[in-house]
UniProtKB/Swiss-Prot annotation:
This is Putative pectate lyase 21. It catalyses: Eliminative cleavage of (1->4)-alpha-D-galacturonan to give oligosaccharides with 4-deoxy-alpha-D-galact-4-enuronosyl groups at their non-reducing ends. Ca(2+) binds at residues 189, 213, 217. Pathway: Glycan metabolism; pectin degradation; 2-dehydro-3-deoxy-D-gluconate from pectin: step 2/5. Binds 1 Ca(2+) ion. Required for its activity. One of its GO terms (biological process) is pectin catabolic process. Its cofactor is Ca(2+). GO terms for molecular function: metal ion binding; pectate lyase activity. It is an enzyme of class 4 (lyase). The active site is at residue 269. Glycans are attached at residues 38, 220. Belongs to the polysaccharide lyase 1 family. It comes from Arabidopsis thaliana (Mouse-ear cress).
Length: 392
């Protein structure tokens, strides 16, 4: 074979490989000129992040995957996922038959009745044909691979408990009409992760963007949820916690939002809360286009040790937003408190209610670290690039 022909085949094969290469998840850009960033600091020690310190320094994390189930904090800390079950390796990125899933697919594993710890044999983009209704006692663990759920309906947690979702890039989720056998019926919402009537849920180190509705929504009596170490970007209505002002079943909702990075291109609802109890701890917020934290129907919101970096738009400096049918006199009684938060570039939090309300202590789900620590290292959030036999 001539040298020219050989070179042509090399170019053809290289182009073919690049055409089907799976793009990497986005990473956090430098915070700003006003916030120091030191990317050389150890990410596994994480300056007091108890979740990451629990497992990321372990060079044998691949062989000790289930240790992750001991690392949750906050209201979702009791979620064990699939720790009591066997490992199941996803080998097939397809979703050809949602009613009768093919063995080896994520849908096949996630819908089994028994506990399972689900891992993946390679990088893959999973384009679902129907939203995936995950069964109880499942861990979906994408560590070690670039696993994406995208370009179709995404994940639904409906009347389940003990779910751990870790290290997935979830993006470009859209609504679809559910099949006739779906227990939910109608259309899926187009959320990245929809949580209905579920409890003991932990979502950690995920990257989420560009979905039709919310990135993560929890409604209809869902409770005991932790959303941590995740990177959210490029979205309008980010996170809804509580179904409606009239739905009293969400009064016992408890959610912890911790160590996340709410990044570029976000507009509102980080989160938007109703009725329940919400502990928002050690997150970084930057450049929200309307507001960061909002709510209605008398939620208790405890914002602790966060960094809020406002944009240069003079009309979007406020962190908070209340939606009240009866005006200021109603929301002034709601217990919203900021403690140890750092406000950058004119950001401000409007508190309300009783400064010393016992509800803050009762529903404090974890110990906050000083907000200043969030500014000493580059945020280590979202999907991680974990290598075998190395600390992650």
């Amino acid at each position: 074979m001539s040298i020219v022909c050989t070179f042509f085949l090399f170019l053809l094969n290289t182009s073919f490989a690049f055409a089907f290469a799976i793009p990497k998840p986005p990473i956090v850009r430098r915070l700003s000129t006003t916030v120091t960033s030191n990317s050389t600091a150890s990410s596994c020690s994480a300056n007091g992040n108890p979740i990451d310190e629990c497992w990321r320094c372990d060079e044998n994390w691949k062989d000790n995957r289930k240790n992750l189930a001991d690392c949750a904090v906050g209201f979702g800390r009791d979620s064990i996922g699939g720790r009591a079950g066997e490992f199941y390796t996803v080998t097939d990125s397809g979703d050809d038959n949602p009613l009768n899933p093919t063995p080896g697919t994520l849908r096949y594993a996630a819908t089994q009745d028994q506990p399972l710890w689900i891992i993946f044999d390679r990088d893959m983009v999973i384009q679902l044909k129907q939203d995936l209704q995950v069964a109880s006692y499942k861990t979906i663990d994408g560590r070690g691979n670039n696993v994406q759920i995208a370009y179709g309906p995404c994940l639904t947690l409906y009347k389940v408990s003990n779910i751990i979702i870790n290290n997935l890039y979830i993006h470009d989720c859209v609504p679809v009409k559910r099949n006739a056998l779906s227990s939910l019926g109608g259309y899926s919402d187009g959320d990245g992760i929809s949580i209905f009537e579920s409890r003991d849920i932990w979502i950690d180190h995920c990257t989420l963007e560009k979905c039709y509705d919310g990135l993560i929504d929890a409604v209809n009596g869902s409770t005991d949820i932790t959303i941590s170490n995740s990177y959210m970007l490029n979205h309008n209505e980010v996170m809804l916690l509580g179904h409606s002002d009239e739905y009293s079943g969400d009064r016992d909702m408890r959610v912890t939002i911790a160590f996340n990075y709410f990044g570029e291109g976000l507009v509102q609802r980080m989160p938007r809360c109703r009725h329940g109890y919400f502990h928002i701890v050690n997150n970084i917020y930057r450049d929200w286009k309307m507001y960061a934290i909002g709510g209605s129907a008398n939620p208790t919101i405890f914002s602790q040790g966060n960094v809020f970096i406002a944009s240069n738009n003079q009309f979007t400096k406020e962190v908070t937003k209340r939606e009240s049918a009866d005006g200021d006199e109603e929301w002034k009684e709601w217990n919203w408190k900021s403690e140890g938060d750092e406000m950058v570039n004119g950001a401000f939090f409007t508190p309300s209610g009783k400064e010393d309300s016992p509800s803050y202590a009762k529903f404090s789900s974890m110990v906050a670290r000083p907000a200043s620590l969030l500014k000493t290292t580059h945020p280590s959030v979202g999907v991680l690039s974990c290598e075998i036999d190395q600390a992650c």
